[in-house]
């Protein structure tokens, strides 16, 4: 039987320092709560740094410094994963 887990993926690269995490949840409500708190922080940081916010939806947030995406960006995604 397949189980579906909700995963929040959070990646931040700031001047070539990479931080990546993937946190699983069995509850969509808890995953959304965690996702929203991370996005709130990342949105605030992006605005302070004058980064371009490319995507800001219920399941994805992406922001980056203009012209320096590979060095300075933030990405947060809420997604479902099937585990066999």
Where are these regions (language model features)?
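Short aromatic-glycine-(Arg/Gly/Cys) micro-motifs in beta-strand/loop hairpins
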Residues: 1-20
């Amino acid at each position: 039987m397949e189980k579906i887990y909700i995963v929040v993926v959070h990646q931040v690269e700031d001047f070539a320092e990479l931080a990546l995490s993937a946190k699983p949840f069995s509850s969509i409500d808890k995953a959304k709560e965690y996702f929203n708190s991370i996005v709130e922080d990342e949105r605030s940081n992006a605005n302070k740094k004058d980064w371009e916010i490319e995507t800001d939806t219920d399941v994805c947030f992406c922001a980056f410094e203009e012209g320096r995406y590979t060095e300075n960006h933030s990405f947060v995604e809420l997604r479902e994963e099937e585990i066999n």
